[in-house]
Structures are given as structure tokens and as C-alpha cells.
Amino acid sequence: MNSLIFGKQLAFHKIVPTTAIGWLVPLGNPSLQIPGQKQLGSIHRWLREKLQQDHKDTEDKDFFSNNGILLAVPKKKVSHQKKRQKLYGPGKKQLKMIHHLNKCPSCGHYKRANTLCMYCVGQISHIWKTHTAKEEIKPRQEEELSELDQRVLYPGRRDTKYTKDLKDKDNYLERRVRTLKKD
């Protein structure tokens, strides 16, 4: 218990980083040591002396100064220019040009080789949606009702401005740009 408290004091005074405290705990506890093992009291003495020296010195010393440890941490945000240089710069990290473009046999637009033409896929999905849409089947009771009775019995919903704006998808959804036709 004593060594645990002592380790926290060391971390507080920046003599030993907090990640190194874990190996200090078994050193002070004799019950955790192997019977033939030497007592390691000299380490505790050295750490106590170091702690007392820091109390004597009024200067706040950093554990990492002149210790040969360099902390590699970015100090500033990477600029837009540096990002572009990495992205488009020389080497294997450079963006590659797409050279494997072919002509779509059905519509004649550019497409990547060994893939489907996105324009044709969009057309097929549109056809599937229109043909598979189910028509609403009205019950027989509603067929005989007049228009006034239907309005009284089933007032329906009134769309708010928000729902009307949501239904107008052309304003906020970006459509896929059609590729150029190959000449």
C-alpha cells in the first residue's frame, strides 16, 4: 500500500510517468517477491532522493528534458497545401488516373471496364420501380360513397410546409451526373 501511494506521488511530481507506476507496486511489497530474490530497497532510496532533490529545487523540471526521448506529436494543423502535396505528390501514394474506361454497349456512355454503366443501372431501377408499384385497391363500401361523404368520413392528411419540402426531392438531392457519350 505504501509503495502505491509513493508511486502516485512520483507521478504527481513528474519524476516517473504514470505509465511506469505499474512496475513500482510489487517492488515495495515483500509478500509478492520470490523468497530467493534480493530486496530492491536501493531503487526506493534512489527515488526518494530524487523526490527530495526536486523539493529542494524551486525549478519545475520535466522528466523528458535531456532524457533522449523525443515525443512525435503534431504541433499544428496540416495546411490545405500540404494535404494536396501528399495527395498528388510523387510516389505510390499519388492518385492514379483511370485509364480503364470503355464505351457502354447499350447506351454509348463512358463506363469503367468490367463494371455496369451507372446510367443503365438507373434506368433499369426506374423501370422496376414503376412496374412493381402496386395500385391501391379500394374497398366496395368506399366506391359507393359520394365525394362529400368521403371527405367527412376520411378527412385525410394536410401536408405541412416541411413535408411538402421533403417531397420535393429535386431541391435537396443531387442527381448522378450523366457521363459523356463516347464519340
Curated annotation (Swiss-Prot):
Compartments where found: Mitochondrion
Binding site for Zn(2+): C104, C107, C117, C120
Coarse class of the protein's main subcellular location: mitochondrion
GO BP terms: mitochondrial translation
A molecular function GO annotation: zinc ion binding
Biological role stated in the UniProt entry: Component of the mitochondrial ribosome (mitoribosome), a dedicated translation machinery responsible for the synthesis of mitochondrial genome-encoded proteins, including at least some of the essential transmembrane subunits of the mitochondrial respiratory chain. The mitoribosomes are attached to the mitochondrial inner membrane and translation products are cotranslationally integrated into the membrane.
Extra information: Present with 1700 molecules/cell in log phase SD medium.
Family to which this protein belongs: Belongs to the bacterial ribosomal protein bL32 family.
Stated name of the protein: Large ribosomal subunit protein bL32m
